[in-house]
Swiss-Prot record:
UniProt binding sites for tRNA: Y18, F69, N71, N117
Broad class of where this protein is predominantly found: cytoplasm
Listed EC numbers: 3.1.1.29
Protein name: Peptidyl-tRNA hydrolase
Protein's gene: pth
Length: 193
């Protein structure tokens, strides 16, 4: 089996003040995967973020947590994609999603940004929107005016546990995603919700 190279991105904001906020659910997912692999992130100035590399189940994986703050995430994504010439078909972005309740994870093949500033910047910089996303539900505050405050605050203990369960579910289907078995991965993941 030929080795494929993938770029796995977790979206979030850098810094300890944001580490436990809902907006960092993408970071949490990537951290959980790195922990499972027993690897550590290191700073990479040319990639505008913290990265790690692993060979896992026949795949050459780059893991990246942009250090550019959410609204400039595309800078980091583009830098690593271009440097290693990773095809867009092998890009997976994990991010928080207000439209899903805590505990729900969904895969999506393409689409708009849905108001997510990290996705908005990535789409603008790539000039395309046809990349894989792992949407990690964090719930919605109920009012659009409260969204910024909501995503930049910590979830309740119950919500955090639910988000962690969704992170685990997202990791469980990663082998199928990397093998190109998206229908199987989506069916497994979406039937858990």
């Amino acid at each position: 089996m030929a080795t494929t190279t993938w770029l796995l991105i977790g979206l979030g904001n850098p810094g300890t003040e944001y580490a436990q906020t809902r907006h960092n659910a993408g970071f949490w997912w990537l951290d959980a995967f790195a922990s499972e692999l027993g690897i550590n992130f290191k700073p990479g100035a040319k990639f505008f973020g913290d990265y790690a590399r692993a060979n896992w189940r026949g795949h050459d994986l780059w893991l990246l947590k942009p250090a550019t703050f959410m609204n400039r995430s595309g800078q980091a994504v583009l830098a690593l994609l271009n440097y290693y010439q990773i095809p867009l078909e092998h890009l997976l972005i994990a991010h928080d999603d207000l439209d899903l309740p805590p505990g729900v994870a969904k895969l999506k093949r393409a689409g708009g940004h849905g108001g997510h500033n990290g996705l908005r910047d990535i789409i603008n910089r790539l000039g395309r929107r046809d990349f894989l996303r792992l949407r990690l539900g964090v719930g919605h505050p109920g009012s659009g005016q409260d969204v910024v405050s909501y995503v930049l605050n910590r979830p309740s203990r119950e919500d955090r546990q639910a988000i962690e369960a969704a992170i685990g579910a997202g990791l469980e289907v990663l082998p199928e995603v990397l093998a190109g078995e998206m229908e199987k991965a989506m069916h497994r993941l979406h039937s858990q919700s």
